[in-house]
Every structure is written in structure tokens, then in C-alpha cells.
Amino acid sequence: MAAAVRSVKGLVAVITGGASGLGLSTAKRLVGQGATAVLLDVPNSEGETEAKKLGGNCIFAPANVTSEKEVQAALTLAKEKFGRIDVAVNCAGIAVAIKTYHEKKNQVHTLEDFQRVINVNLIGTFNVIRLVAGVMGQNEPDQGGQRGVIINTASVAAFEGQVGQAAYSASKGGIVGMTLPIARDLAPIGIRVVTIAPGLFATPLLTTLPDKVRNFLASQVPFPSRLGDPAEYAHLVQMVIENPFLNGEVIRLDGAIRMQP
């Protein structure tokens, strides 16, 4: 007999990078569907303001995902406030565009820049995964044995990295690579792990580009030939949460784009 689809209503979700972009859109959707959201983002973000806009079912938990102490404090705050954590959505990340070697400038990619991207995107994601798994593991399992769901954000750059994306592609490729082994690690305690690899989305990073550039990027998407809407990412997050058999998978959400150099 198939397991019943689980509603997001009543669930508690921690969302990193929750003050803007994909993270904020996810928080809005989940709260709108009756869930509670904890916006985990850096202290100088708009997290406090955005949480207040979303009402009593949302709070801001300031933390840098690279800090064990800060993330643990944020998770403790969430559990003390709401009693448990059912879902974690990892959206926090940064990007740089630096060539490995720039011939005209006679300039090499600095290790500091490479390490910074890896530290936030890859290590930061794993830091949240490992700590939130410890909290979810204390939940009472549902009828299907599930205690929690962890959803990570990679990128199509994990598969078709562009010029200047060595660090970014490495960080997102790492997230893709650790999805299955972590899903297997956490399977015995009933925690699912899924990664979404978005294509070109209308996030703050892209909306600041000139119209000409954005229109060109949108034209590269086969269908629909436009930038993705963050609400579409949030919709997929909800679908992942609600489908109990979806585990250990990386899902491309990209309008069938396959980036060329």
C-alpha cells in the first residue's frame, strides 16, 4: 500500500539564505501553506524585516552557515520556539566570477577566493546538514518512519560550469556528490535528503544585470524561454517535502537548458 502524501501544513522548516531570493520565496510558500519558517541568514541581512512581514509563523535566526556555534544556536532557537524541526532547506550561497588564470592581467585565481566560495557553499551546506540531522533525529517518526527532510541547492553549474566558475562549480558539484551518501547515512533514522539544481533564475544576482544581458540569458532556455521564477523553486521544495519516496536524488529545475561555454 502506498504511503500517503504528507502535507507541509504544521511542519517547521529552517531555511538558510532565507532573507532573500530562493530562500525567501520558499519561506513565503511554506508559510502560505500552513508551515512555520525559520529564516536563517547573516545578521546584516533583511531577515528580521522579512520574518515580520510573514507574521507569527516565521522568525529570524541570525547565523553564518560556516559557523558551527552560530548554526547550532539558530537550530536551538528554532527547537525551543517550535518544539522540533521537520525540514531544512539549504539556500545560502555566494558566487564569484574569476578565471583560473587571466592572461591579459597576468593574474591567477587566489586561493582565498576559491576557499571562500567552497567554505560557504559546500562546507556551510554540510555544516547545516550534520547539525540539523542531530535535531531531526530526536523527532518522533511519522507513520512511514520519517523524521525529517533536508533539501539542498546546487546549480546547473555543477554539470556545465562556465568560464570563471571554477570555485562555484566545484562547490555546487560537491553538493551534488554528497547527496546520495548523506541520504544513505541518514536513511536508518528516517531522514530524506534531496538536492535541487536550479538553472537561470530571476534572483537578486541576475535581476541587477542590464536588460540586454538578462534577455540574452533567458533566450538560452529552451522552454519556457525565460528566467525561472523563485516561486517555481519554492513549489518544487514543497513537492519534495510531500513525496515520501523521493530521496537521494538531484533534480534539475532549468527549462531543459544545457549551458554551452
UniProtKB/Swiss-Prot annotation:
A GO cellular component entry from the record: endoplasmic reticulum
Modification N6-succinyllysine occurs at: 53, 212
Lineage: superkingdom: Eukaryota
Gene Ontology MF terms: 17-beta-hydroxysteroid dehydrogenase (NAD+) activity; 3-hydroxy-2-methylbutyryl-CoA dehydrogenase activity; 3-hydroxyacyl-CoA dehydrogenase activity; acetoacetyl-CoA reductase activity; amyloid-beta binding; androstan-3-alpha,17-beta-diol dehydrogenase (NAD+) activity; chenodeoxycholate 7-alpha-dehydrogenase (NAD+) activity; cholate 7-alpha-dehydrogenase (NAD+) activity
Record-listed E.C. numbers: 1.1.1.35, 1.1.1.62, 1.1.1.239, 1.1.1.178
Modified residues (N-acetylalanine): 2
Active-site residues, record numbering mapped to chain: 168
CDD domains: HSD10-like_SDR_c
InterPro entries, per database record: NAD(P)-bd_dom_sf, Sc_DH/Rdtase_CS, SDR_fam
Keywords from the named record: Acetylation, Fatty acid metabolism, Lipid metabolism, Mitochondrion, Mitochondrion nucleoid, NAD, Oxidoreductase, Steroid metabolism, tRNA processing
GO BP terms, alphabetized: androgen metabolic process; bile acid biosynthetic process; brexanolone metabolic process; C21-steroid hormone metabolic process; estrogen metabolic process; fatty acid beta-oxidation; fatty acid metabolic process; isoleucine catabolic process
Compartment(s) of residence: Mitochondrion; Mitochondrion matrix, Mitochondrion nucleoid
Modified residues (N6-acetyllysine): 53, 69, 99, 105, 212
Catalytically driven reaction(s): a (3S)-3-hydroxyacyl-CoA + NAD(+) = a 3-oxoacyl-CoA + NADH + H(+); (2S,3S)-3-hydroxy-2-methylbutanoyl-CoA + NAD(+) = 2-methyl-3-oxobutanoyl-CoA + NADH + H(+); testosterone + NAD(+) = androst-4-ene-3,17-dione + NADH + H(+); 5alpha-androstane-3alpha,17beta-diol + NAD(+) = 17beta-hydroxy-5alpha-androstan-3-one + NADH + H(+)
Residues at which NAD(+) binds: 20, 22, 41, 65, 91, 168, 172, 201, 203
Recorded metabolic or biological pathway in which this protein acts: Amino-acid degradation; L-isoleucine degradation; Lipid metabolism; fatty acid beta-oxidation; Steroid metabolism; Lipid metabolism; bile acid biosynthesis
Gene3D superfamilies linked: NAD(P)-binding Rossmann-like Domain
UniProt KW Mitochondrion keyword: yes
Binding site for substrate: 155
Protein purpose: Mitochondrial dehydrogenase involved in pathways of fatty acid, branched-chain amino acid and steroid metabolism. Acts as (S)-3-hydroxyacyl-CoA dehydrogenase in mitochondrial fatty acid beta-oxidation, a major degradation pathway of fatty acids. Catalyzes the third step in the beta-oxidation cycle, namely the reversible conversion of (S)-3-hydroxyacyl-CoA to 3-ketoacyl-CoA. Preferentially accepts straight medium- and short-chain acyl-CoA substrates with highest efficiency for (3S)-hydroxybutanoyl-CoA.
Entry's family note: Belongs to the short-chain dehydrogenases/reductases (SDR) family.
Subunit: Homotetramer. Component of mitochondrial ribonuclease P, a complex composed of TRMT10C/MRPP1, HSD17B10/MRPP2 and PRORP/MRPP3. Interacts with TRMT10C/MRPP1; forming the MRPP1-MRPP2 subcomplex of the mitochondrial ribonuclease P complex.
Name this protein carries in UniProt: 3-hydroxyacyl-CoA dehydrogenase type-2
Species assigned in the record: Rattus norvegicus
Lineage: Eukaryota, Metazoa, Chordata, Craniata, Vertebrata
Gene name, Swiss-Prot/TrEMBL: Hsd17b10
